[in-house]
Amino acid sequence: MGESIHGLERSHKCTELSSSNIGEKVTVMGWVQKQRNLGSLVFIDLRDRTGIVQLVFTDKDGEMFDKAKTIRSEYVIATVGTVAARSAEAVNKKMATGEIEIIASELRILSSSETPPMYIEENSDVNEQTRLKYRFLDLRRPDMQRNLILRHRVAKVARDYYDQNGFLEIETPILIKSTPEGARDYLVPSRVHPGKFFALPQSPQLYKQLLMVSGYDRYFQIAKCFRDEDLRADRQPEFTQIDIEMSFVNVDDVLEVNEGFVKKAFKEALGVDVETPFTRMPYAEAMERFGSDKPDIRFGMELVNMSDLVANCGFKVFTDAVAMGGSVRAINAKGCAKFSRKEIDALVDLVKTYKAKGMAWISISQENEIKSSFAKFMSEDEMKAILNRAQAEAGDLICFVADKNNVVFDALGQLRLEIARKLDILNPDEFKFLWVTEFPLFEYDEEDQRWAAKHHPFTSPMDEDLQYLDTDPGRVRAKAYDMVLNGVELGGGSIRIHIQELQAKMFKMLGFTEEDANRKFGFLLEAFKYGTPPHGGMAFGLDRLVMLMAKRNSIRDVIAFPKVQNASCPMSNAPDVVDETQIEELHISIAKE
């Protein structure tokens, strides 16, 4: 049994104490980081959310001294004592409280602890599975606490900023109608309505649009969202987004308001000045220059189109790609001619994982000796033209991919990032934002042989492209935009369709029958009959934003209790079986495997 806290009141958190408190009687409480027994003295490092302060117990204290000797790491204690200056040789400049210590006069052990399965310290070298199984211990570590405090600060900035800009925080339902948005819905069976199901929202999309129809003008919400999909480093089955919608706006209005939030968040939470307005880049330009719709613009190494130079050369791989309507493009990896054949082969293997058939290359040594995987098929003039366009110099490695455009862009876009990582030129302290705009409204689904929405069915076409809706859907651009930071999509949105007839037409183009559209979205189409303002908005992934601000590699590091790769929780063992009576009440049965 632990001792009672009765009669004690904490006067300070650990790092609220400094040399200005010397001579004061204080009461501190927290966890024992470590205990050191030096015979006539016992030192205890006491830890709370703010940091560590040193407690001192002497053998003159009798019973209290004996009690201090029994204390182990992670015991929870309360101590009353007097703040004193450390001796000059004992000052620890690495600690916020390194100039002081507390000479204890009272000690209570509030609860004891077993030996923890992991060290509770900064950057503890422990595998992630153990960290997640004992997440309640992992969250005691200073780096994890900093991450969650940063998350809190960003969320607070969001609430303050959007409130100051006339937005209302309105909660939308968690139990909704299933209208899958590309990923699978999490379904919730209804006990009251046998055979029917709610879904957990993938986003508040329809409800925030209905709030605009309802006249609320500016809405925001820090919303929980759910997607039943395979996980990656930046995906979770449940995630949090900062959700925004605005009435009577155009694209510029939405971008300006939301980059203002990001600027304020970085300044207030990190002390970092973010330059605004952000760079804006149409989707087509992003693909042409970087091979990606979320380019990392901290470095160059842009794609170069070589198609016209090689259309009639002797290298069949190049000529065939151009003849079938594809392209031949390259990147110049400056200073990479020193790559070994093994390293180049690894780059070839990389592009193959993105459906490229291979990678051609030219290397130029410091002595200007040219080596190439295809030089024997090229004339001297053709090779010279290629090198000129690539702005090649001694020491460079030029990497080529020839294929359909989408394969070329994807492969070279990923190759560009891999080479940047190998060269260690990605500065984690540099934050390069941009907006990617004018996305295609549709993308063609080869498997289903039909057009699908690039973003979602509620995105408005650009006015000047409406004429192509019936005749050339692939040419239609959307009033859509993504915010990108250092190659990571932070969020996205669009101006929405607000005309009922156009929304119905969009559903039809996407393959919905009138009956199906009405069953899934009838309440939205009905609302659009009663005066709908032009509106648009976006959503930020709060998890991703904080992950980048905290310079972490996984959003699991900025979520208190995340799921793992198979969408389970090692700590609580969720999901788990439930009682048979619960299953029966829901009027469902579990199929045998």
Swiss-Prot record:
GO terms for biological process: aspartyl-tRNA aminoacylation. It comes from the Bacteria. ATP binds at R227, D228, E229, Q236, E489, G541, L542, D543, R544. Residues 205-208 are annotated as: Aspartate. It is an enzyme of class 6 (ligase). It is found in: Cytoplasm. Its EC number is 6.1.1.12. It catalyses: tRNA(Asp) + L-aspartate + ATP = L-aspartyl-tRNA(Asp) + AMP + diphosphate. The keyword Ligase applies. L-aspartate binds at E181, R227, H455, R496. The keyword Disulfide bond does not apply. GO terms for cellular component: cytoplasm. Keywords: Aminoacyl-tRNA synthetase, ATP-binding, Cytoplasm, Ligase, Nucleotide-binding, Protein biosynthesis. One of its GO terms (molecular function) is catalytic activity, acting on a protein. It holds the Pfam family tRNA_anti-codon. Homodimer. Belongs to the class-II aminoacyl-tRNA synthetase family. Type 1 subfamily. Catalyzes the attachment of L-aspartate to tRNA(Asp) in a two-step reaction: L-aspartate is first activated by ATP to form Asp-AMP and then transferred to the acceptor end of tRNA(Asp). This is Aspartate--tRNA ligase.
